[in-house]
Amino acid sequence: MWLQQRLKGLPGLLSSSWARRLLCLLGLLVLLLWFASSGARRAAGGLHLPSWARSEPGAAEPSACLEAATRAWRGLRDRGEAVPLGPGVPALVANGFLALDASNNRLWVTPGEREPAVTPDFVPFVQLRPLNVVAEAGEAVLLLREGLLRRVRCLQLGTPGSGPAAGVPGPASASGLSAGSGRDCVLLQEDFLAHRGRPHVYLQRIQLNNPTERVAALQTVGPTAGPVPKSFTSTLEKVGDHQFLLYSGRSTPLPSGLVHLVVVTSKKLVNRLQVAPKTQLDETVLWVVHISGPIHPQVLKSKGAKELKALQDLARKEMLELLEMPASELLQDHQYLWAQLFSPGVEMKRITDAHTPSGLTVNLTLYYMLSCSPAPLLSPSLSHREREQMEATLNYEDHCFSGHATMHAENLWPGQLSSVQQILQLADLWKLTLQKRGCKGLVKVGAPGILQGMVLSFGGLQFTENHLQFQADPEVLHNSYALHGIRYKNDHINLAVLVDAEGKPYLHVSLESRGQPVKIYACEAGCLHDPVELTSEPGGHTFSVMVTQPITPLLYISTDLTHLQDLRHTLHLKAILAHDEHMAQQDPGLPFLFWFSVASLITLFHLFLFKLIYNEYCGPGAKPLFRSKEDPSV
């Protein structure tokens, strides 16, 4: 009863101003004390884990380890050179002959240029299963400039019998280390790649850093999951000090009934990898894949043995050659060739509409197309004569790329790809598009030519007999982008579409000299001004965007100065306008029907108003404007 009376009197107490001030002061004091106590706890105890991490010992340590191990990826992601794996980003590593899905552990082999990819019943990569692990965190990323997939896993070792694989005895279980070191993490890094210079080779690099006080152990499963597939047989080959496994078999029959013979050699790996405390492990597993052409099952019995032996001899020879090489040299060779191949490209600087692909989409598409395209020019077995012929084809001024730009072709620059099979179909579509647009010579060269054609097509660049012309649509120049590494004669040209502070687009051209210097000139649309000689100065050269009537290319680049000077007399133009003037003519404002409707409504309103006034003062029964004095109502 007493408490009820006091509660009834509480609103009256708070109605006074001094009571409200006192209550606010007390609340502020409580907040200050809480912040001071939490700061003291942080200063005294260092980093405090969240409650969920403290309730599960060690749950946050792998995450912190992973954050430190992948910190260098942030800058690469910002520059569009690294793409985390996830939905819409298949884990593909390929070199035009081999294609491997690292996530689903599948292998595709392309027997020939016009033949579809074959999927042998063979699991390509080694699977690593850590022993005695109580917590784990991992992340994978495609490194576009290195041509590989990198997967990082941080493993927290537990006491023997606490991990998911505790039922498997081994040295790690017998280490007898105390639980006090269970909060340390082991860093496992795997690199997956299909070698760019050796089309039959793919590899998996395993690096394990064990800073703990206990032995770290990994169970290896592979290269086939479980027993060898029924379509394959395996033998252990011993040559000198080297041992490797030889797998022989056939692919699944094609719809036509034809089959392919497949031979795979693999470096032999122990069943369990062990890393002593405070040490590191660096192991590279190599594979060599050879495949025959399509064979009819009836012919397989008579010619199959001879064909299979020839494939086995090729695979043995290449595997022995690889085993004599340092693994680091093989990796460095791949990274160098891939960086050289990926030097041209497209850089998206500013996007103002929803139909233009993002920089991530462009770089990922270029990576996938390079991965699915062979590069015979990079093969070490290529003869000097064949190399010269391919270089001449690559530098030939073909009529590539004819037609409109592909910048807004969503089927060529898809925002998401769901599977490796979809990537292979996209590669076929790109090759067909380039061949139909005058780029047959570039497609024939392989990956360098296909990349050149894709860069040309993105911006609407086209080679003619005498010059290189930039024929982009003037209406899409509100997007800023740069095209790098365009081959012209012995030099590389960089062309960028930029926007100034007032929102007006302009062109920036720079030159990278390669080999014998050649004079190159450029002039904007119509060549109204004298051509400018392009040099390799760091600042480059800028050109204003001029639009002609009728529309012609926005920029001409040529080694023939006289040809550019003659263009102004042979184009036969009606007018040459600045870009903003052209856009003003293209978009004069609201349509005529709108203004006609507004004028009609205004006219009708005034006619209606005039009718009201007329009926009021001049119509039947209208009141007089002025009243006389004799009016009795006055």
From Swiss-Prot:
TM stretches of this protein: 590-610
Positions annotated as glycosylated: 363
An annotated GO cellular component: membrane
Subcellular locations according to the entry: Membrane
Signal peptide: 1-40
Keywords attached to this entry: Glycoprotein, Membrane, Signal, Transmembrane, Transmembrane helix
Extracellular side: 41-589
Predominant subcellular localization, coarse grouping: membrane
Membrane topology: Single-pass type I membrane protein
Protein name as annotated: Uncharacterized protein KIAA2013
Originating gene: Kiaa2013
